[in-house]
Amino acid sequence: IVADVGQDTWEEVSIAAAGANLGWSRAEANSCFAKHGPCTLSDYKGAFVQYGREEGKSVTGGYVYRGAQIPALKGLYIFADFVSGRIWSAPLPSTKSPVSAHVQLGQFGRLISSFGQADDGTLYVLDFAKGAALKIVASSSN
């Protein structure tokens, strides 16, 4: 799974096998990037998640949730945005649905630089500014 910071318009997350062509510099996420000549999107491996600059400006890759503490997240890809502090989940793509809708899980006043995963599948958010590792837990309303 590749989280790719965009150029001007889109942040993207793709599943790419070794050597896959994600389209740069002709495509950005699932859109042609007009500054660099002709573009045929079917030539490239598209993103399964993309979001625009109104949601964030620098995607931070995460993990597929495999823990037992939050069953509702099981099998979902958890990722974030470094600038906005938003954390999202998205189902992995399938042949029936190659593009996934992402759901915001929370927004924090933090610079989320990475995630960590414990042996039991517990996920942690890494805060760049404070050097902290914060455990992801279910909200008390769940």
Where are these regions (language model features)?
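Beta-propeller domain segments
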Residues: I1-A101, A132, I136-S139
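Short coil-to-beta transitions that initiate beta-strands within beta-rich domains
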Residues: V59, Q107-S113
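Small/polar loops that bind or transfer phosphate-bearing groups
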Residues: F79, Q107, V125
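Conserved beta-strand positions that form and line the central face of beta-propeller blades
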Residues: Q104
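Blade-level signature of beta-propeller repeat domains, shared across WD40, Kelch, NHL, RCC1
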Residues: S113-N142
